[in-house]
Swiss-Prot record:
One of the record's GO cellular component terms: extracellular region
Protein name: Coiled-coil domain-containing protein 126
UniProt region (Disordered), positions on chain: 114-140
Entry keyword set: Glycoprotein, Secreted, Signal
Entry keyword annotation includes Coiled coil: no
Known glycosylation sites: 110
Subcellular location(s) of the protein: Secreted
InterPro entries in the record: CCDC126 (IPR042759), MGT5A-like_N (IPR027833)
Signal sequence bounds: 1-26
Main location per the UniProt record: secreted
PANTHER family on file: COILED-COIL DOMAIN-CONTAINING PROTEIN 126
Encoding gene per record: CCDC126
Length: 140
């Protein structure tokens, strides 16, 4: 009889512990869902990068117009070099974004393939193809 009473008490303690653990887990999940930052899509990020670079180049051009003398052609050569450098940097940034997108797509496909119950899928194919915007052509 004493053994059944202690078993019931242990069962109640265990259920209370599981209830508290579930409640804490649910609260942490809600906190993560509502507090995590919202990520912008890569298309919007690309557009922002290109727009900001165009504004930067225009601002440099205006600054060079204001400070450039008629005989000073060296500043225009520097401007062209700067513009090429920015184009190369933007192209590198966009290539890295595309690689990151492909990795994320691959992980998403693998995750969804692992969660399916059919198990008939062999090698998953990424959802998107490698579509790359050529940044250097649009800036020059």
């Amino acid at each position: 009889m004493v053994f059944t009473i202690s078993r019931k008490s242990m069962s109640q303690k265990l259920s209370l512990l599981l209830l508290v653990f579930g409640l804490l887990w649910g609260l942490m999940l809600l906190h993560y869902i509502f507090q995590r930052p919202r990520h912008q899509s890569s298309v919007k990020l690309r557009e922002q990068i290109l727009d900001l670079s165009k504004k930067y180049v225009k601002a440099l051009a205006e600054e060079n117009k204001n400070t450039m003398d008629v005989e000073n052609g060296a500043s225009m050569a520097g401007y062209a070099d700067l513009r090429r450098t920015i184009a190369v940097l933007l192209d590198d940034i966009l290539q890295r974004l595309v690689k990151l997108e492909n990795k994320v797509d691959y992980i998403v496909v693998n995750g969804s393939a692992a969660s399916t119950t059919s198990g008939t899928s062999g090698n998953p194919v990424p959802l998107t193809t490698n579509k790359r915007v050529k940044a250097s052509g649009s800036i020059r």
